Regions:
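Glycan-processing catalytic domains of CAZymes
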Residues: 1-199
Length: 199
């Protein structure tokens, strides 16, 4: 299945928004859980920082949907930006309306793990995010296009992931290589694993 079969449309973007802010789930559940723990542990002197993911406006998608009475065409950067700004604005509006007691919105995460499809799109997105006083995060996969240029792409923080745990054919030296790459390019590290890591 290629990228062209996976393009989410406005309806799917809206569905994701609804899931993020669903009562009793996701952020709501996290906020309630923290409230329960405060009763036992005491109130911390901070709010827990939340970073929310941004779907990628896939280049050349022409069936995403309408915004302000106009059908968006993602072969045009202005339309990619319009959709992404709409999504960011919705996240900001809903987060504020939810009035979480223990959560604070720190910024946004670019979910695409490579720069193969978005070109320089992240730069104006970053500018918009910064205008809102928020930060922009990225976690490129191992040897992802653009990883070493993460600052030039507009990100404030980037985490290198080694893509090591789930493929047993990859030698453990990948971890050393990924750490060396991260040090060289001023990145943090992110490790993905499942329950087998503690077995």
């Amino acid at each position: 299945v290629g990228y062209e079969h996976l393009n989410a449309r406005k309806g799917e973007w809206a569905w994701l928004l609804d899931r993020i802010f669903e009562e009793g789930k996701s952020l709501s559940a996290l906020d309630a859980c923290i409230t329960e723990q405060i009763a036992e542990l005491g109130k911390p002197g901070f709010k827990h920082q939340i970073v929310l993911g941004l779907p990628e406006a896939i280049l050349d998608q022409k069936d995403w949907g309408e915004l302000d009475g106009r059908t968006l065409d993602f072969s045009k950067e202005e339309d990619q930006l319009a959709a992404t700004r709409w999504y960011i604005d919705e996240l900001m509006k809903r987060f504020k309306a939810a009035k979480y007691k223990n959560l604070e919105l720190s910024g946004f995460y670019w979910v695409a793990e490579t720069n193969n499809y978005c070109g320089q799109l992240t730069v104006p997105i970053s500018e918009y995010i910064h205008s809102l006083g928020k930060l922009f995060y990225w976690i490129p996969y191992w040897q992802s296009k653009g990883a070493e240029d993460w600052k030039a792409l507009g990100f404030d923080v980037a985490y290198q992931q080694p893509n090591h745990f789930f493929n047993h054919s990859i030698p453990d030296s990948r971890l050393d290589d990924a750490c060396a790459f991260a040090r060289k390019h001023g990145m943090a590290m992110e490790f993905e694993f499942d329950e087998k890591a503690t077995a």
